[in-house]
Amino acid sequence: MSKIVKVIAREIIDSRGNPTVEAEVHLEGGFVGMAAAPSGASTGSREALELRDGDKARFLGKGVLKAVGAVNGPIAAALLGKDAQDQAAIDQIMIDLDGTENKSNFGANAILAVSLANAKAAAAAKGLPLYAHIAELNGTPGVYSMPLPMMNIINGGEHADNNVDIQEFMIQPVGAKTLKEAVRMGAEVFHNLAKVLKSKGYNTAVGDEGGFAPNLKSNAEALEVIAEAVAAAGYVLGKDVTLAMDCAASEFYDAEKKEYNLKGEGRIFTSNGFSDFLEDLTTKFPIVSIEDGLDESDWEGFAYQTQKLGKKIQIVGDDLFVTNTKILKRGIDNGIANSILIKFNQIGSLTETLAAIKMAKDAGYTAVISHRSGETEDATIADLAVGTAAGQIKTGSMSRSDRVAKYNQLIRIEEALGAKAPFNGLKEVKGQA
């Protein structure tokens, strides 16, 4: 037994300068785990609640002292003396104590920080790296893989102050033989993209996730400049590097009119019309994955999009599924999408996150492990991706330490595991095997 002797939390600062919750779990024998909760900008309406103080005199209302107080008070009291190795029990104690469907009493940011810190402490007590402990919790001990990165090198939407409506334009270095080589390829394309943008007189300031955030003539132009950068880096688009997009379409959906409004280029679409627009882009560019291609409530539209594109490319549900097994089950039962984006803080505990990954995989869906736009130096998602052999990860661009921390952790893990953690590249993407 790894008995919990102390649980504490504090308010720290995330990559956007906003407060977040960091927790520590201390065990007998001196083992300690520490973790911080991330925070999203474009959030699904059914996500677990991120508790903020609302005191405008502190951090413009974004303080997290209530969540910190929940950890230092009732959560700590309930967990003292409990066995950190029983992750499911630890998470269930916090969920039951909170007593709400969406963790609105303590905040998912409080519960998640403790959940992840507990897993880290338990791993330390067993003398295991975190990814190995996660594999055991997942019921797949010793089964690992290195994830194919989706690198968000042009930021738009809620992640940038520009006129590009689609939120993320990503590259996948599918021609790489290892994760380390994939990171190198991504960095080379990123630096060449800076040159391409400068040559066209575009801004090279970066957005929340470390990608460039220029004003462009259209969303398609984002794909065009990336194509130029891939070629300039000496790679073949479609062979060495493929493309992916996160539309975050809920952010430009007009629910009253049931229209998708790309204000940046002055175009308005019906639900099916927007899916047709996306299909047209996939015929012009080697796009192999599209996330949140419609509003989270547009299930009828998603059925059409899945039918139209689901055999050819990966259709990822983020706001659509919010890492929630109840909602994912509905999607699976109705043939909606073929992949789920996995974000710890959408659901609020490690146990529930692992359940969502398992449900997706059992149904033949892929699971893409993801960061949030508000991050810290905490690199737990790297260990989650390897420890569940999820196969894909989204953790931003090749700048900003909050993004690069995850890539660096993956490089370390790959070095430690060698052939035990294969890098399968494009085979991991739904519809591309």
From Swiss-Prot:
GO terms for cellular component: cell surface; extracellular region; phosphopyruvate hydratase complex. HAMAP family: Enolase (MF_00318). Belongs to the enolase family. Keywords: Cytoplasm, Glycolysis, Lyase, Magnesium, Metal-binding, Secreted. Its EC number is 4.2.1.11. One of its GO terms (molecular function) is magnesium ion binding. Gene3D superfamilies: Enolase-like C-terminal domain (3.20.20.120), Enolase-like, N-terminal domain (3.30.390.10). InterPro entries: Enolase (IPR000941), Enolase-like_C_sf (IPR036849), Enolase-like_N (IPR029017), Enolase_C (IPR020810), Enolase_CS (IPR020809), Enolase_N (IPR020811). The gene is eno. GO terms for biological process: glycolytic process. Binds a second Mg(2+) ion via substrate during catalysis. It catalyses: (2R)-2-phosphoglycerate = phosphoenolpyruvate + H2O. Catalyzes the reversible conversion of 2-phosphoglycerate (2-PG) into phosphoenolpyruvate (PEP). It is essential for the degradation of carbohydrates via glycolysis. (2R)-2-phosphoglycerate binds at Q167, K343, R372, S373, K394. Pathway: Carbohydrate degradation; glycolysis; pyruvate from D-glyceraldehyde 3-phosphate: step 4/5. It holds the Pfam family Enolase_N. It is found in: Cytoplasm; Secreted; Cell surface. The active site is at E209 (proton donor), K343 (proton acceptor). It comes from Tolumonas auensis (strain DSM 9187 / NBRC 110442 / TA 4). Its cofactor is Mg(2+). Component of the RNA degradosome, a multiprotein complex involved in RNA processing and mRNA degradation. Mg(2+) binds at D246, E291, D318. It is an enzyme of class 4 (lyase). Its main location: cytoplasm. This is Enolase.
